[in-house]
Amino acid sequence: MASAKEISQYLKRFSQLDAKRFAVVKVGGAVLRDDLEALTSSLSFLQEVGLTPIVLHGAGPQLDAELSAAGIEKQTVNGLRVTSPHALAIVRKVFQASNLKLVEALQQNGARATSITGGVFEAEYLNRDTYGLVGEVKAVNLAPIEASLQAGSIPVITSLGETPSGQILNVNADFAANELVQELQPYKIIFLTGTGGLLDAEGKLIDSINLSTEYDHLMQQPWINGGMRVKIEQIKDLLDRLPLESSVSITRPADLAKELFTHKGSGTLVRRGERVLRATSWDELDLPRLTSLIESSFGRTLVPDYFSNTKLLRAYVSENYRAAVILTDEGMLGASALIYLDKFAVLDDAQGEGLGRAVWNVMREETPQLFWRSRHNNQVNIFYYAESDGCIKQEKWKVFWYGLENFEQIQHCVAHCATRQPTLLG
């Protein structure tokens, strides 16, 4: 799945969190129905490595089937299911059955799990005349969840709410998840779906979204349809009210471990992210912080005269100095400027966040041609292969490029890389 170093890095990061701040996992009813085995396997694995997720589930398809069988026509207003007293009895039955099905499947898989079908969401009527017995969450009681976590058991929660007087109300599972997340402030919010993530215009998976740099551009795309638009808006609203380190992952149950424990992931990772600073001179940057970023990222020391001897063209640095791209001006060849990628640095604790890609994407938008070199054992080479138009292997280096127009340019850039002096010691 990944290197032992990667897995260990993420496990250490997650293990340092308070138990209830690790992850809230939202499971749709379709996943419970169609992918229960993969779901229980992934959740059990997390428990095996010492992590206990908090699981909240829906039961939409199951509820549709039971209501239809009872002769109750589905009625929605503003996307919310209108719930009559007769329907509520079926809602309770279906939620409890779905909850127990997941809890029993986890227990059969060797995991410890606790069924929590009430006592978490205190609610009031959303609008009784319009929606019937549908609730709006007013308070979240963490006591049942904390008791489960203290016992080392996965809390499995339904989205049923209760009024202070004890009336059960049907609460939309997405709304319940949002309120739970606001109360817990978790490091990870995970939506498990059949699609495994958000898809672009060509049906390809979007691996990461940095909202600070990509949200406005993304929302202008014609292929962002109504459902996806609402989902992205909801995620942004959610993350805007959480700590900067919190993130949303959308993935398949079978890919949950890969999404959590590898830099590459397997789904769509959405973060509020950081703004990307753009500089054209070293004076515009905090050089001690930039030095620390570069040296920490590469595990080596910059040569003492690096900044005085390096002719900066542009630098792109995340606002908290956790990722940076440094470009240098290597003169002209004919009518074309030669731009060299001198450094691409990402701190270990930012690996897997999509922050490096966000900085790279900002750079690439205004850099139509680029060349660079990388050591043969550099783990980033997989990314470089995907981003480049070509690669030539030298004795010590791989030379990458994109946007170069002819063989003369490529030949010149390859020769430059062969003789360029290293700027990192050790």
From Swiss-Prot:
- The chain positions of domain N-acetyltransferase read 274-425
> Per the record, which residues fall in region Unknown?
253-426
- Pfam families recorded for this chain? AA_kinase (PF00696), NAT (PF04768)
Residues bound to substrate are A59, G60, R81, N170
Per the record's keyword annotation, is Cytoplasm included, yes or no?
Answer: yes
* Example of a GO biological process term: L-arginine biosynthetic process
Enumerate the subcellular locations listed in this protein's record, separating them with semicolons. Answer: Cytoplasm
Q: Give GO MF terms, alphabetically.
A: acetylglutamate kinase activity; ATP binding; L-glutamate N-acetyltransferase activity
Q: Which organism is it from?
A: Xanthomonas campestris pv. campestris (strain ATCC 33913 / DSM 3586 / NCPPB 528 / LMG 568 / P 25)
Q: Name one GO cellular component term.
A: cytoplasm
Show which residues form the site (Transition state stabilizer): K26, K231
Q: What is its EC number?
A: 2.7.2.8
Principal location: cytoplasm
Q: Which UniProt keywords apply?
A: Amino-acid biosynthesis, Arginine biosynthesis, ATP-binding, Cytoplasm, Kinase, Nucleotide-binding, Transferase
Reactions catalysed according to its record: N-acetyl-L-glutamate + ATP = N-acetyl-L-glutamyl 5-phosphate + ADP
* Protein name from the UniProt record: Acetylglutamate kinase
UniProt-annotated stretches for the region Acetylglutamate kinase: 1-252
For whether the record's keyword set contains Ribonucleoprotein, the answer is: no
Family the entry assigns:
In the N-terminal section; belongs to the acetylglutamate kinase family. ArgB subfamily.
Pathway the protein acts in: Amino-acid biosynthesis; L-arginine biosynthesis; N(2)-acetyl-L-ornithine from L-glutamate: step 2/4
